[in-house]
């Protein structure tokens, strides 16, 4: 799969599994302006490393927001509640996401 070979526009996000190994899952997610439903928060058991490879997005945490543009990345520790407050539509937001249990680094929210 080429990261930039995008599926036709869909009413919901398109997620594709790129790699899965014990303790690690890597996905490509394409968003055409979708955001988390009002009142919904991700509260994951795994750490999530996100890299925005196209477009822009706004991630909301309980006490702050993070604006991501093309090339930005960060590590979201497990159990840190977050939601997608906004994602670009044209161009669509293309995410590369790795899920697992990682050591914290400077990129941690």
Where are these regions (language model features)?
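A short, N-terminal "cap"/entry segment at the start of jelly-roll beta-barrel domains
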Residues: 1-41
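Short histidine-centered beta-strand/loop micro-motifs
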Residues: 16-18, 38-44, 61, 66, ...
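A structure-centric signal for secondary-structure junctions around beta-strands
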Residues: 23, 46, 92-93
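Beta-strand residues in well-ordered beta-sheet regions across diverse protein folds
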Residues: 27, 52-53, 60, 85
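Short, conserved beta-strand element in jelly-roll/cupin
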Residues: 43-59
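Structural motif
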Residues: 56-58, 65, 81
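Short acidic-glycine-tyrosine-enriched beta hairpin
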Residues: 63-78
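Ligand-binding loop in jelly-roll beta-barrel domains
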Residues: 79-106
């Amino acid at each position: 799969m080429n990261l930039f070979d995008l599926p036709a526009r869909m009413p919901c996000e398109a997620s594709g599994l790129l790699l899965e190994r014990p303790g690690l899952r890597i996905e490509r997610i394409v968003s055409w302006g979708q955001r988390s439903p009002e009142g919904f928060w991700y509260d994951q058991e795994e750490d999530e490393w996100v890299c925005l490879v196209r477009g822009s997005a706004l991630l909301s945490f309980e006490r702050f927001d993070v604006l991501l543009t093309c090339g930005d990345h960060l590590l979201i520790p497990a159990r840190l509640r977050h939601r997608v407050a906004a994602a670009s539509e044209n161009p669509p937001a293309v995410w590369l996401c790795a899920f697992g249990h990682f050591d914290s680094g400077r990129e941690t929210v």
